[in-house]
């Protein structure tokens, strides 16, 4: 999960005050796949006092729906047309019997925050209006500044905000590693492949994307009857999530770009990354094969990078050895791309 810092802030902002009888309100926000939901489910499972109750509100438009769902988790069934007064009366009795305070987590809360101003007012003023001491944590993707204007903020009162930043490559690697240990046999993957999944997923900053690529790559390897996930399985999985290199994009490329791209593919046939030396060697062979010489390799590589076809990074070569540029393709299996390029060059 890699969210220890965020959990500590939630503990200090909401959980500890609520345990001491102080009502607080918090909004968690951040991009999809940044661990908001899994963090709140973890806290709902692990924290006993105060009690943390999780409700997914993606299908709800009103706070009233959330409160009815909340009560149902304790076996209390109420009519959908219940008034706020009757709902909070039932909640007040529940909390009295429980003998501890409650934090209500409302996930996928954007629709409610954008539209149910009356319901939110009742929820935020529940202590004053109904003597119900209930703290709330809203989970959304949008920045609260987009959801609330100054007038609405003043009406609702003070609440805190915590942004869940995007995961780093290292954090995604740890999450993917944990999932691989849980879900796959030890012979089904190696650390280089998991690191490559983290590399491919890092542009999204999303653990969800990394886990999805791992699952799809494992299925692809199984379909090939391979005992181990390959780099090309990862590329195939990535292309299933968000295809970028399409046939129309390839068809629009000029002859020399295709030749350089084919050289890169041949270097990557069994590798995660390649370098300019390997590409240059392969380009010499391909140039001879297709009768095209004097290609400016560096300009062509730069064009492919600018068009998003290839990705590159700078890697150190060890103490005193300097650095070099390494190149990879994330968005399509190089075996498939090789075949498509060869067909275009031969047409």
From Swiss-Prot:
The answer to whether the entry has keyword Nucleotide-binding is yes
Q: Which PANTHER family match?
A: CELL DIVISION CONTROL PROTEIN 6-RELATED (PTHR10763), ORC1-TYPE DNA REPLICATION PROTEIN 2 (PTHR10763:SF31)
Q: What does this protein do?
A: Involved in regulation of DNA replication. Has no effect on MCM helicase activity, either stimulatory or inhibitory. Does not bind DNA.
Keyword list, A-Z? ATP-binding, DNA replication, Nucleotide-binding
Q: Listed GO molecular functions?
A: ATP binding; ATP hydrolysis activity
Q: Hey, which family's this protein in?
A: Belongs to the CDC6/cdc18 family.
**Chain segments annotated as coiled-coil in the UniProt record:** none
Can you tell me which residues bind ATP?
34-38, 167, 179
Q: Could you state one GO biological process linked to this protein? A: DNA replication
Name this polypeptide is given: Putative ORC1-type DNA replication protein 1
User: What organism is listed for this UniProt entry?
Assistant: Thermoplasma acidophilum (strain ATCC 25905 / DSM 1728 / JCM 9062 / NBRC 15155 / AMRC-C165)
């Amino acid at each position: 999960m890699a969210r220890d810092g965020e959990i500590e802030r939630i503990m200090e902002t909401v959980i500890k005050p609520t345990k001491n009888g102080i009502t607080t309100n918090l909004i968690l926000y951040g991009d999809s796949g940044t661990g908001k939901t899994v963090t709140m489910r973890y806290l709902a499972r692990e924290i006993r006092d105060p009690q943390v109750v999780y409700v997914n509100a993606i299908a709800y438009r009103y706070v009233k729906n959330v409160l009815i769902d909340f009560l149902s988790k304790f076996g209390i069934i109420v009519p959908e047309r219940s008034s706020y007064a009757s709902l909070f009366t039932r909640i007040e009795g529940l909390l009295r019997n429980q003998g501890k305070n409650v934090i209500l987590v409302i996930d996928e809360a954007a629709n409610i925050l954008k539209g149910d101003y009356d319901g939110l007012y009742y929820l935020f003023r529940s202590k004053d209006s109904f003597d119900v001491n209930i703290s709330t944590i809203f989970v959304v993707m949008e920045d609260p500044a987009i959801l609330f204007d100054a007038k609405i903020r003043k009406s609702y009162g003070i609440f805190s905000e915590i942004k869940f930043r995007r995961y780093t490559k290292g954090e995604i690697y740890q999450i993917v590693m944990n999932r691989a240990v849980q879900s796959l046999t030890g012979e089904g993957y190696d650390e280089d492949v998991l690191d490559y999944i983290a590399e491919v997923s890092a542009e999204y900053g999303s653990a969800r994307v990394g886990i999805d690529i791992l699952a799809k790559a494992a299925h692809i390897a199984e379909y090939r009857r391979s005992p181990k996930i390959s780099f090309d399985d990862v590329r195939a999985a990535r292309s299933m999530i968000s295809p970028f290199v399409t046939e129309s994009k390839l068809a629009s490329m000029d002859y020399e770009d295709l030749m350089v791209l084919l050289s890169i593919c041949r270097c990557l046939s069994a590798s995660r990354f390649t370098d300019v030396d390997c590409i240059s060697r392969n380009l010499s062979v391909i140039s001879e094969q297709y009768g095209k010489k004097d290609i400016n390799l560096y300009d062509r590589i730069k064009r492919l990078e600018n068009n998003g076809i290839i990705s590159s990074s700078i890697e150190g070569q060890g103490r005193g050895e300097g650095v070099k540029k390494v190149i990879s393709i994330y968005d399509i299996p190089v075996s498939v791309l090789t075949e498509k390029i060869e067909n275009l060059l031969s047409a």
